[in-house]
Amino acid sequence: MAEITAALVKELREKTGAGMMDAKKALVENNGDQAAAIEWLRAKGLSKAAKKSDRAAAEGLVAVKLSDDGKSGAIVELNAETDFVARNEIFQKSLDGIAVAALKADGTVEAVSAAASPDGEGSVDDLIKRMIATIGENMTLRRVAKLSATGRVAAYTHNAVVPGMGKVGVLVALDGSGDLEDAGRKVAMHIAATSPAAATTEELDPALVESEKRVLTEQARESGKPDAVIEKMIVGRMQKFYKEVVLAEQPFIMDPDKTVGEFLKEQGATLKGFVHYKLGEGVEKAADNFADEVAALTKGA
């Protein structure tokens, strides 16, 4: 049997637009023959899904799932083309199953895609292909993450359409004593509202810090004040910046007189990590063109 290399799989995917798992299976079934693999994909009806894979998918839902003992959690973003499909029961049921699979996998899109499908038929990747064919829209498992703690992992979904699914999802991992579930949920709600860039100042992206410092330095120099004064201005403005983007430094939304860090200390809790997904974040949505839309409707009439 021919060796199925990553290069062969990549070549077939570029020719057909098929998913990674489908392309690999096609090559295995056809002993590495590209032409036969292409025909195999067409025969299996996967070309229909492949054609739809070029369409922008920026809607959908974010799902969170916790383990029974509350010590681990998974968060998944599954995209579709329209909000209408995201409210489809098939889509939601499948996403719930994918979130369960994510809880058992290693927290990467690749691992979850290759995991067993919740309906028992093939992989999660196969399940998504079947949904594309059934519902008629492109869908993408965009991102996946997992958190674990010796204490507790809490979850929150903002404006949930069904329990555990919404357009914003947050996981928070805490260690310590006290009511970690309650503290974690409150901090998760805070994160959903404020979108911090990092848990602590030390964890901020150095490039982001340097960029902000350059901007603030230029602004301060425009004041024409002495260097000593400018230096103090920069320090003060950087502290304000940290309060805006660092979770531990932010005023706690449920009690603005204290920071999130102070709230957690009062609760006897230590933040081990957080994940915050906002649906479609960073995905460019296709702009509707009215003229093209009318032309398409006229052509189909």
UniProtKB/Swiss-Prot annotation:
It is found in: Cytoplasm. PROSITE patterns: EF_TS_1, EF_TS_2. The keyword Protein biosynthesis applies. Pfam families: EF_TS (PF00889). Residues 82-85 are annotated as: Involved in Mg(2+) ion dislocation from EF-Tu. Signal peptide: none annotated. GO terms for molecular function: translation elongation factor activity. InterPro entries: EF-Ts_dimer_sf (IPR036402), Transl_elong_EFTs/EF1B (IPR001816), Transl_elong_EFTs/EF1B_dimer (IPR014039), Transl_elong_Ts_CS (IPR018101), UBA-like_sf (IPR009060). One of its GO terms (cellular component) is cytoplasm. Associates with the EF-Tu.GDP complex and induces the exchange of GDP to GTP. It remains bound to the aminoacyl-tRNA.EF-Tu.GTP complex up to the GTP hydrolysis stage on the ribosome. NCBIfam families: tsf. Belongs to the EF-Ts family. This is Elongation factor Ts. It comes from Hyphomonas neptunium (strain ATCC 15444). The gene is tsf.
